[in-house]
């Protein structure tokens, strides 16, 4: 683990415990419904920050979640539309629920999104702490158009962090974005190095997985003659999918 050093109101002690040089997972991928694969750069553990609620002329700081552990997943810049971003986020939310890793309730901040948008490759704008799939899509769409307008006028896109304002329906500046060297990463002295004692057998782990959402979706389409949209809606929730399957089984038995 490393200390990530920066000063901001959501970080009361001035640094965040994170993983930088040695993430838990690297070089994975996730397939969209189109067959396109989104590369996953890394998955690492770090501690959460406080929650900021921005008002018209002030901001409120909620420290209830500060210091709680979280898992962060970082993708490669493989998305070409806001629709792909939303689909990936939705599918990942469903996957977390199916494997029992998290209830992933957006309204409880159990899952949050941060979208990096870059039309001029190399200069990205990070959209922080987006709390719904709809807001994720709308914020990404707005930021694409904002950057396009700047580039069309011959202006530069600044490397910065922005938030999504639901009332104004636009992204707003939060702070200038730091580079990795600005965080002055160094080993966390209060935590010993984390070295898993075993080599994971990926095939054995895969065999223990439950039926995954896209597998259940394909089976429902074939078994119950559902269209793809109905199958998607039913399988978004493991509980709803189980209820549907049990009801269909009981109805079939009653019909006999």
Language model features with spans:
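Basic, nucleic-acid-interacting segments
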Residues: 1-210, 222, 228, 249-254
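Extended, structured, electrostatic nucleic-acid-contact surfaces
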Residues: 214-221
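Histone-fold and other basic nucleic-acid-binding segments
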Residues: 218, 228-256
